[in-house]
């Protein structure tokens, strides 16, 4: 058998593995169920791709994101590794053809969304698939106590029952200890077998700034640290505004969010990857699956609601091992927003049922109907028609997803599809009477295999190049061919979609597991609380603090985060700093305390050290000293 290293060299042209990769691969090759926790950019996909290539058969990769699947398949095919993907952008005919190819062709990887596991078509082909490994990407999605629970992941357990002798490799970049255990349990590991790479990023400097004028600080950071940058914002509107403000400072910047067309997103992403654009200002729709090693700064203009998201997003900086910076900006309003989030993210059951009822009315779905159907969903029109708050609707939809009632895909991209629906004899006659449509028809027949048997994906831009016509002319002719009954034509679609997983129920009888719902809310409150502490009262090394959240107690002070640098400057150990800080907080009453009185209470501590801590707390706006010399806690 070819060694793992030789396989890596042959296809990836690397001479060595990254930390933990080889151990994980060997575990998989030994047939062991394995959980791998590797940081963003740590090479998770290599851990299942290498062993799958070394063994006979097909690796089944379960992944939640269509864009990631497409990227992985494209990258594998570029390496001459045959791979396929089945996702919601395919027609029934295309899914059937893909699964048939997986059975009869010499393919090594089949990427599948978890929703597809329970379809009759997949179940029909499953016994014929020679599966050598089940790889579960974004494995934290299986835990309802995690930050991104997706119910379809629970169906993977049924797959394990069907394939009891096939090992599973679960990979994730961020899972706290309780979620790690949940992954092991839900995926029915035969033995607990977990590989954890340290959550420490020794080249990444974390900093937090409480500041009123975020935009000025943002520009200051970009001017201070040259190179490629990502700026994360919470709202689509803000991404455009901030990109424009950055551009005014003669810094190349663009914006990116899920509301843009697929073509626009691809163009903006490529311009940033090629360094044509220096700064990309984006929502969290950006970044998944993008491997750009030379990002020097990741700046959060808004505070994320949990450490998992922050760690993943910040971790996109400095993948080349050189010094990089993760900067988080916040103000008093951000703190209030975070504190209010648990009640917003977990709406009252009455409100959830109201949104469900309104959704059924909007989509015109009668009681007892709808299971398995996909519906176009314009959320802006919906909230306007039913006078609902858009944040309530988004959060109610998330709850309905987690309860297994529906799925909401905001980033849907369905390519155009076409199929000839007349016989070849009639087609020949038609060509004679409609010569103006001949070029497009011949292009379809020559370019798209299977187009006479059923709907297949077509690419209108490709047709424009081959026929030397404009995109408008091609679309018009395709519509004309449909009107004349020659083809069935489904234009490209980027409208968000709702998929009902069950028949519509009367709203008053809609089942929501209240005990689990409350427990998920409590878990979320703990995540927000940890994030708030990171912002407002973290006096230990930030790298150490982040790592402790994920259960990694081995990390030492990084010496490069804002907290470490500040404590270095005041020549205090962490223990000394915390001791002085504690006395200060305990001494200051609600009415405040004169500075002289505070220094008396710090008797026995060197005055310069005491003042250094006071000055630090003042600069961090945790305390304030008024004109009378009275110290108060802010």
Predicted regions and their residues:
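Helicase motor core with emphasis on the C-terminal RecA-like subdomain
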Residues: 2-11, 15-19, 23-45, 52-55, ...
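C-terminal accessory region of SF2 helicases/translocases
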Residues: 294-295, 299, 303-312, 318-627
């Amino acid at each position: 058998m070819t060694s793992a290293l030789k396989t890596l060299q042959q296809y990836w042209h690397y001479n060595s593995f990254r930390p933990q990769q080889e151990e994980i691969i060997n575990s998989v090759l030994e047939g062991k169920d394995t959980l791998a926790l590797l940081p963003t950019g740590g090479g998770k996909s290599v851990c299942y791709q290498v062993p799958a290539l070394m063994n006979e058969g097909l690796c089944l990769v379960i992944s939640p994101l269509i864009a990631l699947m497409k990227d992985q398949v494209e990258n594998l095919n570029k390496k001459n590794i045959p791979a396929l993907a089945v996702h919601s952008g395919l027609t029934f005919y295309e899914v059937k053809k893909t699964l048939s190819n997986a059975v009869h062709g010499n393919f090594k990887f089949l990427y599948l969304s978890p929703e597809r596991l329970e379809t009759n078509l997949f179940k029909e082909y499953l016994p014929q698939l020679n599966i050598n490994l089940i790889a579960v990407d974004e494995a934290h999605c299986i835990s309802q106590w995690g930050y991104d629970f997706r119910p379809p992941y629970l169906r993977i357990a049924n797959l394990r029952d069907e394939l009891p002798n096939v090992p599973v490799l679960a990979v994730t970049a961020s899972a706290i200890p309780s979620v790690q255990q949940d992954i092991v349990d839900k995926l029915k590991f035969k033995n607990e077998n977990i590989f954890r790479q340290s959550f420490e990023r020794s080249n990444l400097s974390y900093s937090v700034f409480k500041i009123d004028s975020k935009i000025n600080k943002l520009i200051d950071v970009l001017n201070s640290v040259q190179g490629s940058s990502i700026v994360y914002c919470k709202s689509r509107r803000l991404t455009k505004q901030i990109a424009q403000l950055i551009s005014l400072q003669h810094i190349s910047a663009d914006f990116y969010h899920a509301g843009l067309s697929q073509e626009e997103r691809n163009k903006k992403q490529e311009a940033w990857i090629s360094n044509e654009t220096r700064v990309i200002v984006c929502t969290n729709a950006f970044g998944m699956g993008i491997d750009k090693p030379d990002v020097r700064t990741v700046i959060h203009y808004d505070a994320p609601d949990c450490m998992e998201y922050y760690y993943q997003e910040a971790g996109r900086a400095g993948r080349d091992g050189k010094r990089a910076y993760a900067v988080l900006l916040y103000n008093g309003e951000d703190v209030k927003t975070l504190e209010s989030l648990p009640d917003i993210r977990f709406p009252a059951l009455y409100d959830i049922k109201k949104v469900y009822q309104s959704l059924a009315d909007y989509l015109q779905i009668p009681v007892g109907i709808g299971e398995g159907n996909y519906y176009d969903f314009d959320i802006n029109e919906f909230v306007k028609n039913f006078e609902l708050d858009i944040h309530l609707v988004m959060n109610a939809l998330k709850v309905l997803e987690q309860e297994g009632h529906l799925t909401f895909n905001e980033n849907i991209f369905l390519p155009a599809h076409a199929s000839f629906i007349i016989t070849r004899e009639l087609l020949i006659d038609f060509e004679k009477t409609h010569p103006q449509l001949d070029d497009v028809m011949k292009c379809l027949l020559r370019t798209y295999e299977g187009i006479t048997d059923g709907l297949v994906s077509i690419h209108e831009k490709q047709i424009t190049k081959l026929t030397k016509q404009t995109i408008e002319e091609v679309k018009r002719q395709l519509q004309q061919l449909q009107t004349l009954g020659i083809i069935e034509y489904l234009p490209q679609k980027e409208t968000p979609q709702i998929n009902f997983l069950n028949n519509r129920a009367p709203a008053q009888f809609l089942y929501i597991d209240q005990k689990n719902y409350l427990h998920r809310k409590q878990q979320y409150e703990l995540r927000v609380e940890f994030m708030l502490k990171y912002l407002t009262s973290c006096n230990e090394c930030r790298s150490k603090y982040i790592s402790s959240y994920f259960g990694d107690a081995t990390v030492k002070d990084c010496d490069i985060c804002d907290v470490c640098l500040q404590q270095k400057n005041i020549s205090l150990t962490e223990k000394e700093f915390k001791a002085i800080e504690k006395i200060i907080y305990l001494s200051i009453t609600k009415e405040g305390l004169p500075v002289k009185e505070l220094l008396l209470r710090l008797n026995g501590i060197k005055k310069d050290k005491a003042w250094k801590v006071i000055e630090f707390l003042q600069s961090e706006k945790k305390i304030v000293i008024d004109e009378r010399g009275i110290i108060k806690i802010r």
